Amino acid sequence: MPDLAFRLPATPGSIALARHELDRLAGEVDAEQLDVLRLLVSETVSNSVRHAGAAEVIDIRLWLGRRSIRLEVEDRGPGFRPRRVSRTNGGWGLVIVERLARRWGGRSGRPTTVWLELDRQPSTA
């Protein structure tokens, strides 16, 4: 079971809402790592909003392991080819994910899921 899970409408306002939901992790996750998670959730939710369609929803799930953090963002959009992502495809979103995450990937189709993992940093809170 995820440590944090929530569902948002696939609308532009959900990008900020998703970042705000991560505030629940303050004290459990290192402050700098929480900032990285906010950036990563912004980029992945932005992609979902762009591709899922306004009538759809986005599911966000996060697991806090002893050594890693896993984030999944799922939508009902048309999917994509995870390893063929580049800046020329319309944005920096998955390029940023690739640079900041230890590992990442996705499952294309309906639903489409982007997942990523970070090495967990000790909390300083």
Question: What is each PLM-predicted segment?
Answer:
Residues 1-5, 48-125:
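Conserved beta-strand-loop-beta-strand hairpin that lines the nucleotide-binding pocket
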Residues 1-20:
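Short beta-to-alpha transition helix within the HATPase_c
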Residues 7-11, 30, 85-87:
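Alpha-helix initiation/capping motif
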Residues 11, 33, 37, 90-93:
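The cytosolic transmitter module of two-component sensor histidine kinases
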Residues 19-42:
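Conserved short strand/loop->alpha-helix "switch" segment adjacent to the catalytic nucleotide/phosphoryl-transfer site
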